[in-house]
């Protein structure tokens, strides 16, 4: 996996070196059913000044934002974020949702709810669950680029979660490997290599985000077409080029910064036909709606 990690770091550096163009945010962000595939050209820009009580502009290129999420969606928001040198997201508390910062490139300072601060860089993963606080600062000389993914479980016992005090910081060195053959309900080919902050087997019923991993598909390997019954699964491409298949059987070529998702009742698949490794984030989240809740 060392070779894969070096390839990811190089790709991240190249991906963030050039100018990226994205369309402006829609004039109105309203709840609607999101699509399954957002290539880079589909992302829209929304910037926030002083995010979390911080300083400077938090630049965001989004597949979709929380204002567009349905009540029953587990994953509420996915964005590629940039903090310029000297900018920071202030330390703030999450009341009823979960927020993961997954570092792509640059260096920053992540602060957790206990006031502990760590230098974070490419590949490090962080999370704030209900009742926890976090902040992120760019004190370096280059842009700090990271994925920001927000999820929510409406039936979570918030008071219980606030007392649990689960881990918030997962450096590359603490992540663990787990590889799967024929991924996708046994329908895939080859091996899906994974390096995880945590996996679904260790998740509690209350937690919305069940799993975060950095995955690799080698040439000729694939995740077979499979359906998600009661959770959301997003593949976010970091480097390489692959072919994503949605529930309707439509194939789309996906590359760096592409965002894909399958919700409850939806199917998806991903394959790598190229020589270069296909590296992506795989995040699984689940929302158990409260009784009687509708869209």
Question: What do these predicted regions represent?
Answer:
Residues 21-75, 122, 156-209, 224, ...:
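A short, N-terminal "cap"/entry segment at the start of jelly-roll beta-barrel domains
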Residues 130-156, 258, 264-290:
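Ligand-binding loop in jelly-roll beta-barrel domains
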């Amino acid at each position: 996996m060392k070779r894969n990690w070096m390839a990811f770091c190089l790709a991240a550096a190249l991906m963030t070196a050039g100018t990226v163009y994205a369309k402006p945010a829609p004039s109105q962000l309203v709840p609607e059913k999101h699509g399954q595939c957002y290539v880079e050209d589909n992302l829209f820009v929304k910037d926030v000044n002083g995010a979390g009580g911080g300083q400077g502009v938090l630049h965001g290129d989004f597949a979709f934002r929380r204002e567009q999420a349905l009540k029953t969606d587990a994953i509420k928001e996915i964005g590629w974020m940039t903090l310029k040198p000297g900018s920071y997201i202030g330390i703030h508390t999450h009341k009823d949702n979960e927020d993961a910062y997954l570092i792509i490139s640059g260096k920053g300072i992540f602060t957790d709810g206990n006031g502990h601060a760590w230098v974070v860089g490419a590949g490090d993963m962080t999370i704030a669950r209900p009742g926890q606080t976090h902040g992120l600062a760019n004190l370096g000389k280059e842009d700090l680029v990271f994925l920001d993914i927000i999820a929510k479980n409406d039936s979570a016992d918030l008071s219980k979660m606030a007392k649990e005090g689960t881990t918030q910081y997962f450096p590359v060195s603490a992540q663990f490997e787990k590889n799967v053959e024929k991924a996708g309900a046994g329908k895939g080919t080859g091996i899906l290599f994974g390096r995880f902050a945590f996996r679904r087997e260790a998740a509690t019923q209350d937690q919305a985000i069940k799993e975060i991993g950095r995955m690799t598909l080698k040439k000729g390997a694939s995740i077979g077409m499979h359906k998600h019954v009661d959770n959301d699964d997003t593949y976010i491409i970091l480097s390489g080029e692959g072919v994503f298949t949605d529930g309707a059987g439509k194939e789309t070529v996906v590359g760096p910064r592409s965002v894909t998702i399958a919700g409850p009742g939806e199917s998806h698949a991903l394959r790598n036909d190229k020589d270069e490794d296909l590296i992506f984030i795989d995040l699984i989240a689940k929302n158990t709606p409260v009784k009687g809740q509708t869209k």
